[in-house]
Regions:
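Beta-propeller folds
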Residues: 1-227
Length: 227
C-alpha cells in the first residue's frame, strides 16, 4: 500500500484471512529513499491500515480497537479506542454481515488534513452467536484438527434476527477527544460506507434501512458532529 506522497510503502507479511475480504497481517513500513524496512507495530497482527493524506501517519485495527502510528515521532504508537472486544464491539472494520452484504473490509478514514480519524463502530453484543466445526482439510491443513474437530464461533444474524447496531465516531488527534457523530439512523439500519472528502471539515457517511431500499448520504463535520 503506497503512501499518498509516494515516500513509503506498507508491505504485508504472514497474512491470515478472516472472512471473504478481511485479513490480518504483520505490516512493515518501507521507506523508498533510504530503503529502510521497519515493523508497523510490535503489538501483534494488524488489520485495515490506512495512510493519512500527508503520509506521516498510519491508522490500523488490532483486536477490534483502533491504533495510530506517527512516522515523524519514531513510529510512536498510541491506542485510540479501548472498548473493542471480540464478539461484542468492533471499531473501524465491519462485522461479518456488513462485510458480506456491502463488500468492504475497512470503515476507518482520515480527514483531508490528517488532523482527525473517523470510523464506524459495530456493537454486536446482542447478535446471536453461531459455531462452525473445523476439520483438518487441505490448503491449508489445520493439523490441530486432525483427530478431533475444532470450533469457530462468531456473531451470525439470521434473517429477521438482530443485527449489529452501528454508529459513527471521530477522534481529534491533537486533543485526543472522541465524539459520536450525529447521523439519523434507525437502530436496525446500516452504514455501508464512510468516505473522506477534500474538505477537512467534511466526511460522507452512507446509510441504509434494514430492507436496503433507501440509501442516504450525509455530509458530516467531524468536529461539530453535525450532519
Amino acid at each position: 500500500i503506497m503512501s499518498p506522497d509516494g515516500r513509503h510503502i506498507l508491505i504485508s507479511t504472514k497474512r491470515q484471512n478472516v472472512y471473504r475480504r478481511s485479513y490480518k497481517a504483520v505490516f512493515y513500513i518501507y521507506t523508498v529513499q533510504s530503503r529502510k524496512l521497519e515493523r508497523l507495530s510490535d503489538g501483534g497482527p494488524q488489520q485495515a491500515p490506512v495512510w493519512s493524506p500527508d503520509g506521516n501517519q498510519v491508522a490500523f485495527v488490532r483486536d477490534n480497537n483502533i491504533f495510530l502510528v506517527k512516522l515523524l515521532y519514531g513510529n510512536s504508537e498510541s491506542q485510540v479506542t479501548k472498548d473493542g472486544k471480540i464478539n461484542e464491539v468492533i471499531n473501524g472494520i465491519p462485522d461479518w454481515v456488513n462485510e458480506e452484504e456491502f463488500g468492504f473490509n475497512s470503515a476507518l478514514v482520515f480527514t483531508a488534513d490528517g488532523s482527525m480519524l473517523c470510523w464506524i463502530k459495530y456493537d454486536e453484543s446482542k447478535v446471536k452467536q453461531y459455531s462452525l466445526q473445523l476439520f483438518k482439510g487441505r490448503s491449508p491443513e489445520l493439523t490441530e484438527n486432525a483427530i478431533y474437530p475444532g470450533t469457530y464461533s462468531y456473531k451470525y444474524p439470521k434473517a429477521g434476527e438482530e443485527n449489529s447496531r452501528v454508529s459513527a465516531w471521530s477522534y481529534d488527534i491533537k486533543s485526543h477527544r472522541i465524539q459520536q457523530l450525529n447521523i439519523p439512523l434507525a437502530t436496525d439500519g446500516y452504514m455501508p460506507r464512510i468516505v473522506s472528502t477534500v474538505d477537512p471539515d467534511k466526511i460522507v457517511i452512507y446509510t441504509m434501512n434494514r430492507h436496503q431500499d433507501v440509501l442516504n448520504l450525509y455530509s458530516v463535520n467531524p468536529r461539530s458532529t453535525i450532519s
